[in-house]
Structures are given as C-alpha cells and as structure tokens.
C-alpha cells in the first residue's frame, strides 16, 4: 500500500485474521481507527492491553471474565440447581442475551469429533460430571448445536450422567417466523418429531 508503514500493515494483517473480517474490511477498520485516533484507537488499544492482561477462563464453568470464578458462578441467585451445557463461550453469551435462563452454565470447549481427534478428555466433560455431584444439580440442559458432533456429544453426556440427574435438551424445529418452504429436510423432520399438543 502506498504511504503505509510496517506497523499499519501489520495491524491490518492482524485485523484480517479476526472472524468476519477480510483484508478489505480490515483496511477500512484500521483506516477508521486511525482517523478517530482519540475517540477510538487509543481507548481501544488501552482496553485491549488491559483485557490481554486480565482475561481468563472461569475455573468453574469455562466462561471468560477477569477473575478466576466468573460473575455468573458467584451469583447465589443463579444457584437454581439447573446447569445449561453449551459448546463454547459464544453460546453462553447468546443464552445470556436471550434472558430466558437464570441458572448456571458449563462450557464444554467444543464437541466430540472423531475426525478431529477430540475426545471427552479434551473437553470439560469430566468437570461437568464433578459439578453435577458437587453442586447438587437437579437438571442438566444440553444446549448444544444441532450438528452431528453436537448430537454425538449430547448422547455421550447423557450416557455419562444418565440416572444421576434430569437431562433435557433444547427443542429443535421450525423457528418463529420460519416458512416451511425455506427449511431444510432435517429441520422439518426434527420439528415433526418434537411436535406438541395445542
């Protein structure tokens, strides 16, 4: 790029590695940050340094925060006996945004995958079993993605925890506002199997 420096090029390359950003979007973002240096770039750089120094994984559930035990795990009001199991932190944050779940979470850190060589010990499944006992959990809600690996993981967890705790999973099927014509066969099939009385 004409007139650029190595530092700016390096920043663009790093930004382009972020999910959802390619080289063009990264260039636009960096240019915008430079133009708004006092308003955006400097505070962003300061906060990124602070987060880099303080961010850590919750030792209990796997959420991301700035202390060893996250705010959700330390909130006594959330000790409802319900534990929502999710694949990753982004899923936990999505559940929190919805505001429908008021219990605690357990982040697996992925799903079982024979192709990728991911077994139970690479995930937080053993810790999940420990928490069910230690925290007197009455229900484990499996909020895993409706993929082959997600369902394989759900079945494995069900085998490991079966009989010790009530196990439920999120309903699957037609989304609100969804039209059957636009849905894939698997979604329609899941919706038919999960149908309920009116």
Swiss-Prot record:
CDD domains: TOPRIM_recR. GO terms for molecular function: DNA binding; zinc ion binding. GO terms for biological process: DNA recombination; DNA repair. Residues 81-175 form the Toprim domain. Gene3D superfamilies: 3.40.1360.10, 6.10.250.240, RecR Domain 1. Keywords: DNA damage, DNA recombination, DNA repair, Metal-binding, Zinc, Zinc-finger. InterPro entries: DNA_Rcmb_RecR (IPR000093), Rcmb_RecR (IPR023627), Rcmb_RecR_Znf (IPR015967), TOPRIM_dom (IPR006171), TOPRIM_RecR (IPR034137). A zinc finger (C4-type) spans 58-73. Belongs to the RecR family. May play a role in DNA repair. It seems to be involved in an RecBC-independent recombinational process of DNA repair. It may act with RecF and RecO. This is Recombination protein RecR. It comes from Ruegeria pomeroyi (strain ATCC 700808 / DSM 15171 / DSS-3). The gene is recR.
């Amino acid at each position: 790029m004409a007139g650029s420096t190595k530092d700016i090029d390096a920043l663009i390359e790093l930004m382009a590695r972020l999910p959802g950003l390619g080289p063009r979007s990264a260039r636009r973002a960096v240019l915008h940050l430079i133009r708004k240096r006092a308003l955006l770039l400097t505070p962003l750089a300061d906060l990124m340094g602070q987060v880099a120094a303080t961010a850590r994984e919750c030792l209990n559930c796997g959420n991301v925060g700035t202390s060893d035990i996250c705010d959700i795990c330390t909130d006594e009001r959330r000790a409802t006996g319900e534990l929502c199991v999710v694949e990753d932190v982004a899923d936990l944050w999505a559940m929190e945004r919805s505001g429908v779940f008021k219990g605690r979470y357990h982040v697996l850190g992925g799903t079982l995958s024979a192709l990728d060589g991911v077994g139970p010990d690479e995930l937080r499944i053993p810790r999940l079993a420990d928490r069910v006992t230690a925290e007197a959990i009455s229900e484990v809600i499996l909020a895993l993605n409706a993929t082959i690996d997600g369902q394989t993981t759900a079945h494995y967890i069900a085998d490991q925890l079966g009989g010790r705790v009530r196990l439920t999973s999120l309903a699957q099927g037609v989304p609100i506002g969804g039209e059957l014509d636009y849905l894939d066969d698997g979604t329609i099939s899941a919706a038919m199997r999960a149908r309920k009385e009116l």
